[in-house]
UniProtKB/Swiss-Prot annotation:
GO MF terms, alphabetically ordered: structural constituent of ribosome
HAMAP family, per the entry: Ribosomal_bL35
Keyword Ribosomal protein (UniProt): yes
Family named by the database record: Belongs to the bacterial ribosomal protein bL35 family.
Keywords assigned by UniProt, alphabetized: Ribonucleoprotein, Ribosomal protein
GO CC aspect terms: cytosolic large ribosomal subunit
GO terms of biological process kind: translation
Record's protein name: Large ribosomal subunit protein bL35
Length: 67
């Protein structure tokens, strides 16, 4: 059976850290920013770590070869 391909959409959205955790971007920061509070915009900067259950699914189904 051939290797599973990495999903192209997941390659663009997630990165694997050295310890095997999955890092992603925070949502809700592209447009309509005037309606959002300063706190929400500030907290949406940078990246966040996925929870273990979510990261297990991402690694199994979307990044089988490590991204």
């Amino acid at each position: 059976m051939p290797k599973m391909k990495t999903k192209s959409s997941a390659k663009k959205r997630f990165k694997l850290t050295g310890t095997g955790k999955v890092k992603g971007n925070v949502a809700f920061k592209r447009h309509c920013l005037s309606a959002k509070s300063q706190k929400m915009k500030r907290q949406a900067r940078g990246t966040f770590m996925l929870f273990k259950t979510d990261s297990d699914n991402v690694k199994k189904y979307f990044l089988p070869n490590g991204g």
